[in-house]
Amino acid sequence: MSGVPAVNISIESSAEKQVQEVGLDGSETYVLPLSMSQNLARLAQRIDFSQESGEEEAEAARELEWAEQEEEEGLVKFQPSLWPWDSVRNNLRSTLTEMCVLYDVLNIVKEKRYMHLDPVSQEALPPKPNQHGLLLVSKKKSLAAAAQILLKGAERLSKSVAENQENKRQRDFNSELLRLRQHWKLRKLGDKILGDLSYRSAGSLFPHHGTFEVIKNTDIDLDKKMPEDYCPLDVHIPSDLEGSAYLKVSIQKQAPDIGDLGTVNLFRRPLPKAKPGTPHWQTRLEAAQNVLLCKEVFAQLSREAVQIKSQIPHIVVKNQIISQPFPGLQLSISLCHSSNDKKSQKSNSDKMGAEDHLYVLEHNLHQLIREFHKQTLSNIVMPHPASAPFGHKRMRLAGPQAFDKNEMGFMQQNEGLLEKIIKQAKHIFLRRRTARTIDSLASRIEDPQIQAHWSSINDVYESSVKVLITSQGYEQICKSIQLQLNIGVDQIRVVHRDGRVITLSHQEQELQDFLLSQMSQHQVLAVQQLAKVMGWHVLSFTNHVGLGQVESVGNASSITVTSPNGDYAISVRNGPESGTKVMVQFPRSQCKDLPKGDVLQENKWQYLRGPYKEVQWNKMEGRNFVYKMELLMAALTPC
């Protein structure tokens, strides 16, 4: 082991002293540690003499706090006093003094031998003269001062509330203005806010400005409670657009006197109920815009009524346009505008009642004016190139597919609002007249039955209805009469089942006569179909009988059928006016009243049928014609 070289081990002791300063050369200056007496004095100064003996938890918490304080601040620098126990002595002396004073006070209160405590008695002051008056004056001054303070406070509170309400109204006005801008076009002109009610942006050419003004609602009293329907925003609408308006379209049979024109019975249409939550200005603006649109439509119709050249001129008087689509029939278009004043409401309330107003045509007028606006916008010509191909103009325009003058003029013809609405009115009137004619025949004539099936898909100028003529209980075998009526503007096209087309005019009598003749033919056709089912043979059939009574409406139809064995024959004649006449032919052997002659000697001539005998059709039992005919055929058919 002696041969191993020694190893130097450096041992550094732990820093037991607090470093006070580190020099620039790296030297450290340490704080001298406290002596035992100084450490004891430091601990004695930390004693809290106001602490009770039972507070051990608080003492432990205080010791923990001291430990944390020592860790944060480091070693407390002790400032030695003249005597280490000086603070302890001072605390003990003050405590002893307090205890002695407390002991003396308790002895004095408990034992009366040391001191007796009596209440101090004061002599009553002599009453001063007018003491009550002074008291009242002082109370009055006090109440006046208090009232003045309360009044000043109330005034300040009212000013604060008014300012808050004004700020709230200003905020509500801005929010309502924002809602208004979302629905209507607004612009600011100076210190005014103006809106636009017209349809110029949609293509309208009506010269009315249609401007309304947005104002702030200041009619409310700030001292009173704000109503529930209060709106901080209000609109000022021109006087000629106030109230409600509509276009009354009616069809009348008799034309009034010329002195009664322009005095149409106007009834005030109630405004539509606003949706819950809709502001009142929205309802007013919509009503004003509707008034403006109605005035534009009526102005356009009046202009066209004056310009159009027709066989029967149109009449424009005041707020009414009268046209004559059919002879003895007039179409009246009136502008009904009622303001919101009380006088007009009273006068119009007496005239309200059932009117012959055609709401369909009013709706169509609004649609037509919107289509006119759309065409106005679509007719805007886009910029064209400034150059063109060289050559003569006649060579450029001519060609094999060039249009002549008539074709160009026909292509440039456009129907106006008045012409379109007159055509629609004609179609509506013709459709109503057709329905009324069919219903009257169905209610008046029970046999055969007539049924009408109206199509749900129609056009404004054309409608269709399918007419079936049947017999009750025999719908499967008696369905040969099926008519398709195409109702147009001036005429009715009838399409038969076999494809034949008949054109009828607008006259009601023509349609009625045609349906009566078809119902008459149905009875004969029903006998033909029944004969096939019963096994009878058809000898003759015609829809136009040339013999017998001449019918004023249509022609009579007839059919003759024989029994399966040929013994009996039935002849049926049916006319629209003369009615039904049924004849039966019996064999000669069953005719006893035949005169005997020498001409027919052989027995074979006895098998010929004798003369016809008319059947008393009214006394036959059965619910309809076909049922009676079935019973008759069954009775004449051999077993």
UniProtKB/Swiss-Prot annotation:
Disulfide bonds: none annotated. InterPro entries: Mediator_Med17. Its main location: nucleus. The keyword Repeat does not apply. Keywords: Activator, Nucleus, Transcription, Transcription regulation. GO terms for biological process: regulation of transcription by RNA polymerase II. GO terms for cellular component: mediator complex. The keyword NADP does not apply. It is found in: Nucleus. GO terms for molecular function: transcription coregulator activity. Pfam families: Med17. It comes from the Eukaryota. Belongs to the Mediator complex subunit 17 family. Component of the Mediator complex, a coactivator involved in the regulated transcription of nearly all RNA polymerase II-dependent genes. Mediator functions as a bridge to convey information from gene-specific regulatory proteins to the basal RNA polymerase II transcription machinery. Mediator is recruited to promoters by direct interactions with regulatory proteins and serves as a scaffold for the assembly of a functional preinitiation complex with RNA polymerase II and the general transcription factors. Component of the Mediator complex. This is Mediator of RNA polymerase II transcription subunit 17. It comes from Xenopus tropicalis. The gene is med17.
